[in-house]
Amino acid sequence: EYGFNFDKYYNQQKNIKLIVQIEHFEAIENLEEILAIDGIHGSFIGPYDLSGSIGKAGDFNNEKLTKLLKKYEKISKKMNKSMGFHVIEPNHKLLLEKINKGYSIIAFSFDAYLLGTKLNEELKNYSDFSKNDI
């Protein structure tokens, strides 16, 4: 089939959605202008970089970051644009929180964090083992 259905391939461009990455506080300050660009369907927040842009890298509970996210949500909803977010911590409650706020594009944690978190949990369970237990 490869190479024989060019019309089908060409027409798929109608289904492509353009999502921009928002990783700096200045992008949120200019979000209306960014989302007004023809062809942009939504945006995606990178929380590490966004928090870093305000000098609070990784501080996801910072008040200034919370205000930026509320502004992001308000503008995105007003402009009827899809919202995305990278939920770093592998916690289903944080995932549901974003879904309930209207986020429809979500990255859930990342491989090294997931593996490391689970490994640390399991190692705590086995820290009392002796050689006789193995």
Model-derived features with residue positions:
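Expand to "…catalyze enediolate/carbanion chemistry for C-C bond making/breaking, isomerization
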Residues: E1-I134
